[in-house]
Amino acid sequence: AYLKTSGGKGYHVVVPWRPAAGWDAFYAFARRVAEVMEQKWPERYTANMRKNRRAGKIFIDWARNGRGATSVAPYSLRARPGAKVSMPIAWEELDTVAPDGVDIREALRRLGERDPWEGFFRQDQILR
């Protein structure tokens, strides 16, 4: 799995899969992962979409995996003040790079560094 900033309020965990399963299978898998995280660590995570039920917890937005759902692509500029970028980051940076912590200047600087998603397209994972 790979990590990127959203350029907004959260992070996105991206898993490269071979296209072998349909939308329903991916959606069900993402929902189940969110449910397990919520059950195992209820004080930390929630899969509940209601904002008033998730205060102080990390929201696992499994619905982003449904057909027709949208998500910002890596390296995309956000239409927000400060020219924030959805930027691939290394897992080791999770504690130091905020979800909206990469602006266009920082993104351009990072392009000259090692790619934290190196090997992404060589993954051979399949969801059954």
Where are these regions (language model features)?
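Short beta-strand
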Residues: A1-G7, N48-N52
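Short, conserved phosphate-binding/catalytic loop or strand-edge motifs used
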Residues: T5-V15
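Generic "edge-of-domain/loop-turn" microfeature
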Residues: G10, A20-G22, R67
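Catalytic palm subdomain of template-directed nucleic-acid polymerases
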Residues: V14-F26
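C-terminal accessory nucleic-acid interaction domains of nucleic acid-metabolism proteins
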Residues: D24-R128
